[in-house]
Regions:
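Transmembrane-helix boundary motif in ABC transporter permease subunits
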Residues: 73-103
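Transmembrane alpha-helices
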Residues: 131-135, 167-200
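Periplasmic/extracellular loop-to-transmembrane helix junction in inner-membrane transport proteins
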Residues: 4-7, 11, 35-77, 220
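Hydrophobic alpha-helical transmembrane segments of polytopic membrane proteins
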Residues: 211-249
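Membrane-spanning helices that line or support transport/gating and their immediate boundary helices
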Residues: 31-34, 87, 94-101, 144, ...
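Transmembrane alpha-helical segments of polytopic membrane transport and secretion proteins
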Residues: 1-21, 243-275
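Short helix-to-coil transition segments within interhelical loops
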Residues: 149-155, 159-179, 220
């Protein structure tokens, strides 16, 4: 019974803290708009932005699904590419010295500048959006995998060799678990920017209907409430995707659940897993 109450209390704290933060942001928004007499065409009240979303949800929902689809596909492609490229570069030092500068150079290209040639090559379709998201995601994953594999405890690796473990078994049972912390750090960084990449892709390569173009249309019509409401929807997608990655980290690394719980994005203080 006591354990059940502790679990319920843990869930309540993990859910209640972010909800409280959201409420505080909305209250601050309301106070600024009302207190400084901000014109509605500059910044609407939170209720107006929320109403703009709920009243047009039948139109927004298909667009939201499209953005989520682009984010998921691009994230999966970028994460897989980043993981395998990171492993190869960590294992072959010559490739690391050869390819690493190219990777850094690739990230120096502004995403907006990258979008135009992608549209010329792939056309106005979902493909350029997926490529842009993957482009954003793969770099932090690659860098963190290289860093993780470069700092594996060599004593454990040598001990595995002494006991006759194959390279493949050593890789999966020692090196990959040891790399889980930097790997998921890279995935969480990628998750944070994945939705941004999808929105940029929609602005540059949309074939007529997308969440980004819906916001642009609202902006051109001076529908400020819809502009802010769409921004809230985009933010909700990004936060949800980040939390999903955190949840996967918790379940995929059972040996680190206590640490992951302690590093919960908005949690500070005592170890949640011990409460």
């Amino acid at each position: 019974m006591r354990a059940t109450r502790r679990r319920l209390g843990l869930v309540a704290r993990n859910v209640g803290i972010p909800i409280l933060s959201l409420v505080l942001v909305l209250v601050l928004w309301q106070l600024i708009v009302v207190g400084f007499h901000v014109a509605s065409y500059v910044a609407p009240r939170p209720r107006a932005a929320i109403d703009a979303v709920t009243q047009n949800w039948s139109v927004l929902w298909p667009l939201v699904l499209g953005t989520i689809r682009e984010t998921v596909y691009g994230f999966v492609v970028g994460a897989a590419l980043g993981f395998f490229l990171g492993v190869i570069m960590a294992k072959v030092s010559f490739l690391q010295g050869l390819v690493y500068p190219v990777l850094v150079l690739s990230q120096a290209i502004p995403i907006i500048a990258l979008a135009a040639p992608l549209v010329l090559i792939l056309g106005f379709s979902t493909a350029p959006k997926i490529v842009i998201v993957a482009w954003i995601v793969f770099f932090p994953v690659t860098v963190n995998v290289i860093d993780g594999l470069s700092h594996v405890d060599r004593d454990l690796v040598n001990l595995a060799k002494v006991y006759g473990a194959s390279r493949w078994r050593t890789f999966w049972q020692i090196e990959i678990p040891a790399t889980s912390t930097p790997l998921f750090s890279g995935l969480k960084i990628g998750a944070t920017y994945a939705v941004t990449g999808a929105i940029i892709g929609e602005l540059a390569a949309s074939d007529g209907s997308s969440l980004a173009l819906y916001q642009e249309h609202a902006n051109s019509n001076l529908n400020t409430a819809a502009v802010y409401g769409t921004t809230m929807v985009m933010t909700a997608i990004g936060i949800s995707w980040f939390l999903l990655v955190v949840g996967v980290e918790v379940f995929a690394t059972p040996w680190r659940r206590r640490t992951v719980a302690r590093r919960w994005p908005w949690r500070r203080g005592r170890d949640l897993a011990d409460r």
